[in-house]
A protein has these predicted regions:
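N-terminal glycine-rich, Lys/His-bearing helix-loop that initiates the first secondary-structure elements
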Residues: 110-147, 525-615, 978-997
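Conserved PLP-enzyme active-site core in the AAT-like
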Residues: 529-534, 608-611, 615-873, 932
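Acidic, proline/glycine-enriched N-terminal capping motif
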Residues: 101, 116-207, 212, 343
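N-terminal amphipathic/hydrophobic targeting modules at extreme N-termini
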Residues: 2-6, 37, 41, 67, ...
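Glycine-rich, acidic
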Residues: 120-126, 143, 247, 251-418
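Conserved small-domain helix->loop->beta segment predominantly found in fold-type I
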Residues: 410, 414-417, 842, 849, ...
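PLP-dependent enzyme catalytic core of the Aspartate aminotransferase-like
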Residues: 1, 527-531, 618, 922-997
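Glycine-rich, small/acidic residue-mixed loop/short-helix segments
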Residues: 370-526
Length: 997
């Protein structure tokens, strides 16, 4: 079994996997697509006159079941002799696992075929393919490998589980240069070229005036002074004619550099590790899709793009000088990659529902032209930005989009503008689909299969992050189709397979890339968990609930070492007060001008909570060192939303009659670099951030990080971005935080450059560290501070907002807006019980802050040093003992984080698995994020963290069961510190506890 988060790290496992794939390939030979390109002649194999069957001979049956065997040419001294042997034996030649062929019957035809094949173009890697035993075919005028000896099934599965190499050097590589290169590309491509910056790529389509596709392509910006446009191999000459015809009037040039540069697609979960092994372990690109990088691979220059045609969440396309192509290919094979041919490339892209020109673009099975908006990727590849002007096909595409929008609302009254769409299709009945087969709904012809075959997949067991990828594989009949636009996801249809109607369905997709590093097959018909409805006597359930609650409380509070940095345990006093009356009461209030801005409450019985809230504001002003505090928000996320809403309202204060303008550019920490989710366009910022009309993306720019320390901001690079974008709002703060934020330096710079902005610090994780041992944000120049009150701070789970505006400041009006956007804008009942508990937490924090904060910082540094000494890979700068906060980060290997975190939990050590700045997502997490604040409060000191570090090293590195020792260690630290132990307070708390029972 292979756990979902694991890579294959040793040669023995490679050998096992390889043997499994070979066995699967032998068992699952199948027939696939009969035609690759309707505008070209039938594809032909290099051996004899065998050719891909346009009649789909043997369609739907496995070759062994059809009584056929793969031709054997052992002992042949030449290629011609091998073909002759096959012919003399009377075998019908069958391409293993892909398409059936008929053997040549006449020697003259063999000679003619060999002469024709010798006239085909060859890539820089042709000799490498032949030496590896590849079966070569005519593909769009190129002699290309269709498969290698292991077969297409093996190649497909190896790509999905390890790493495969694809020769994509046959594709056209066009260099666009000159002063008007961007304007030209804006005119001939559907995408918004202005959205590209150096280091980025984009998918695009070359459109004709009718809104059909001349070709689809990828545009790369490796350098500031040129673009690289990569087009389909079979269309290169046609594309060049089209593009050069449109070049008139533009001061730029098009140069075909296909011969000078080779291209290799390196695809699969292990590809990043293999390529980084050639790059000295350095980052290839940013971990986002379409990111680019120029790197040195063992001294050879390479241009690396995080792109690909397999659907893999981890995949790169590498461009190298032609002279370096064979070296790179062979070097990657040495490291464990396997070569793969066009056959596997087709099954992989089909599983990913990626279009192939001449199948899902170009001419439809009925001879009509497929509109661009019939292809789902048009949503990303077509722009109507004003930046583009009147580009080729714009008018037709705008019409198509109008129909597309109607269909999204399920308005199919008029389908004339976009009658059909490309969609995935899956057979329910046993059989195999082929391109061109008709699709029916009842007696009505509703479309055609455009691509179809039998595709392998790995079976799994378990669910969620516990899903395990098994060695066993299965197969499923899937494909793509061109179908009536009013056919919806999950609709049932029938496919006419050689006169027999087979049941099929239109799924949403065939696979998902949302849980890297693996692409996950989505099998149609897998039952979702049933939605149960409670019934019967609830008394036993209530008893079970309280028993489990008691068990969980004892486990977390008495037996576990809790290291999740976003958590803390409130004191007994805070917990008791939070559960007391006025919990579940209401105390809505606001300032009323008619009463000289006095607070007016909407409910009676609120005098006590009124006093509590006023006292809490006073305590938090003292803690922050600021002028105003809002305590009614219920979380850090709500605090941020209230601030963003207020900033947007403040921006529009002069015009209440027009549509409100959203916030312009915001500068923040990217979520992959540790930024808060609540400060991202996908989070609390979502409804308040403008779309940049140039990039057509949210107007957000991210703080750059140091090349040698991705956890620390590169201040000088940040200053350049500040000067370029001049953001309206700057948001400091991270959830993966090892360093102080450079608030003072940025404040000084924006003031000097006269950048009118608002500086906000989201201190959710470090709110309890504000002070001389960490940072004083307002003293350093922050205007706004938001945060959560339950991480390093001592409070229950709430939010808070502080500002440093005075009544005569212009932005004091912003403060008043923040108040109104809190109530009634964000919250009605502001949870009075936890607000009461929060006042006690504020008393505790102000009383013990100095000793607590010093202990937290010292413990974090000591813990980091101990973890390192015990052999673990601690992230951060060793010059500062790896951290300046409560957090410590340990790298455990790409994709290993979830499993290691689960293993530690089984041993009563609760941590947070974390994706590092170089990783693609939480399922690919290769680190553990830990915080020392909670255990510091329970009395852990340097010696205790050192002992804990040793236990963790034993568990992580050696797989030792340390549960009993962890329980013993925790059992020695059950008394909370940094809280009041006054006898009178304890007596009253006992009385309160008795009343709460």
């Amino acid at each position: 079994m292979f756990p979902s988060g694991k890579m294959f790290l040793d040669k023995r496992r490679f050998a096992v996997i390889h043997s499994v794939y070979k066995a699967d390939s032998a068992a699952y030979k199948y027939i696939s697509i009969g035609r690759w390109d309707r505008e070209r002649s039938q594809l032909r194999r290099r051996r004899g006159t065998q050719k891909l069957s346009g009649k789909r001979t043997g369609s739907g049956r496995y070759s062994e079941k059809a009584g056929r065997q793969r031709p054997t040419t052992e002992g042949a001294t030449s290629h011609r002799e091998g073909i002759s042997q096959v012919t003399q034996r009377g075998h019908k030649a069958v391409m293993s696992g892909f398409v059936s062929f008929f053997a040549a019957q006449k020697r003259s035809m063999i000679l003619k075929e060999e002469k024709r094949m010798s006239e085909l173009k060859r890539t820089q890697l042709y000799d490498v393919h032949v030496a590896a035993g590849a079966e070569m075919v005519d593909f769009g005028g190129w002699e290309m490998p269709i498969q290698y000896p292991d077969g297409i099934i093996a190649e497909h599965l190896y790509t999905r589980q390890v790493c495969s190499l694809f020769d994509v050097s046959h594709m056209g590589r066009l260099l666009i240069e000159g002063p008007e290169r961007q304007a030209f590309l804006q005119h001939v491509l559907t995408s918004n070229v202005a959205a590209l910056d150096v280091g980025l790529a984009q998918y695009c389509i070359i459109a004709n005036e009718n809104g059909g596709a001349v070709d689809d392509a990828y545009l790369y910006m490796f350098e500031a002074d040129n673009y690289l446009l990569v087009v389909n191999a079979a269309n290169t000459e046609k594309d060049l004619v089209h593009l050069r015809a449109a070049l008139t009037g533009f001061d730029c040039t098009i140069t075909d550099i296909s011969k000078e540069w080779a291209a290799i697609a390196v695809q699969g979960p292990k590809c990043k590790e293999l390529l980084m092994g050639l790059n000295g372990g350095k980052q290839l690109t940013e971990p986002m899709k379409n990111a680019l990088g120029i790197v040195s691979l063992e001294g050879h220059e390479a241009r690396v793009a995080k792109t690909g045609y397999t659907g893999e969440p981890l995949g790169y396309e590498v461009y190298v000088r032609s002279a370096d192509a064979a070296w790179l290919w062979n070097r990657l094979v040495e490291l464990g990659a396997h070569p793969a041919g066009l056959g596997a490339r087709d099954t992989l892209r089909m599983e990913a529902s990626l279009p192939l020109y001449s199948h899902e673009m170009g001419t439809a099975p009925d001879g009509s032209e497929i509109p661009i908006f019939a292809v789902p990727l048009a949503k990303f590849a077509v722009s109507f930005s004003a930046q583009k002007g009147d580009y080729i096909g714009r008018a037709a595409l705008e019409k198509q989009q109008r129909y597309f929008k109607r269909y999204m609302d399920r308005d199919f009254a008029d389908m004339s503008g976009l009658p059909r769409k490309i969609a995935p299709i899956a057979l329910v009945d046993r059989g195999v689909m082929r391109a061109g087969m008709e699709i029916y709904q009842g007696d009505k012809l509703v479309g055609w299969v455009t691509s179809g075959t039998m595709v392998p997949y790995f079976k799994t067991e378990g669910e969620g992050l516990s899903t395990v990828i098994l060695e066993a594989s299965g197969k499923r009949a899937i494909g793509l189709c061109y179908i009536d636009s009013n056919i919806l996801t999950d609709d049932s249809v029938e496919v006419d397979v050689r006169g027999k109607r087979l049941k099929a369905v239109i799924p949403a997709r065939h696979m998902s890339v949302g849980a890297p590093p693996f692409a996950r097959p989505l099998l149609y018909g897998v039952e979702e968990e049933a939605h149960n409805v409670g019934s019967g006597d609830r008394t036993p359930k209530a008893l079970e609930l309280v028993k489990k609650a008691l068990e969980n409380h004892q486990w977390r509070q008495e037996q576990c070492v809790n290291l999740i940095p976003s958590e803390n345990t409130p004191s007994r006093a805070v917990r008791l007060l939070s559960g007391s009356d006025p919990a579940c009461r209401y105390a809505e209030h606001k300032r009323v001008l008619a009463f000289y801005e006095r607070e007016v409450f909407y409910y009676q019985g609120t005098k006590f909570i009124d006093e509590v809230e006023r006292l809490l504001v006073e305590e938090m002003r003292a803690y922050f060192g600021c002028t105003e505090v809002e305590t009614r928000t219920l979380s850090g996320q709500m605090s941020n939303m209230a601030v963003f809403s207020a900033l947007m309202d403040w921006k529009n204060r002069f015009d209440r009659k027009s549509e409100a303008k959203r916030l312009g550019y915001v500068m923040n920490n990217h979520i992959i670099k540790g930024g808060h989710l609540s400060a991202q366009p996908m989070g609390a910022l979502h409804d308040y951030i403008a779309i940049d009309p140039v990039t057509e993306k949210p107007a957000v720019v991210n703080f750059p990080v140091c090349a040698d320390n991705p956890y620390k901001m590169d201040v000088e690079a940040a200053k350049k971005l500040l000067d370029r974008y001049r953001p309206e709002l700057i948001v400091f703060g991270k959830s993966m935080v090892l360093h102080k934020e450079p608030v003072a330096e940025i404040r000084k710079f924006v003031d000097e450059q006269n950048i009118h902005t608002t500086i906000m610090y989201d201190m959710a994780h470090v709110l309890g560290l504000i002070g001389d041992h960490f940072q004083n944000p307002f003293a350093e120049g922050a205007e706004l501070v938001t945060g959560s009150t339950h991480k390093t701070f001592f409070g229950p789970q709430r939010g808070i907002i502080g500002v440093n505006y005075k009544e005569d400041d212009l932005k004091y009006g912003l403060w008043k807006t923040i108040q109104s956007r809190t109530f009634p804008g964000s919250v009605s009942n502001h949870h009075l019980g936890t607000q009461l508990g929060m006042l006690m937490a504020a008393y505790e924090m102000n009383q013990f802050r100095d000793t607590y904060q010093k202990a937290v910082i010292d413990n974090a540094k000591s813990f980091a040093r101990s973890l390192k000494a015990h052999g673990l890979d601690v992230a951060g700068d060793p010059a500062i003992d790896y951290t300046e906060t409560h957090q410590v980060i340990v790298s455990v290997g790409y994709g290993e984080g979830p499993e290691i975190a689960e293993r530690l939990e089984r041993n009563n050590i609760v941590v947070n698995y974390q994706a590092t700045p170089d990783e693609e997502g939480f399922t690919a997490s290769g680190a553990l994020r830990m915080g020392v604040s909670e255990m510091t409060r329970f009395g852990f000191e340097a010696k205790d963290f050192d002992k804990l570090a040793g236990l963790m090293a034993d568990c992580i590195l050696r797989g030792t069961d340390v549960k009993e020792e962890v329980q013993k260690l925790r059992g020695e630290h059950l008394e909370m510190r940094y809280c009041f132990d006054d006898a009178e307070i304890d007596q009253v708390l006992e009385e309160l506890a008795a009343k709460l029972v």
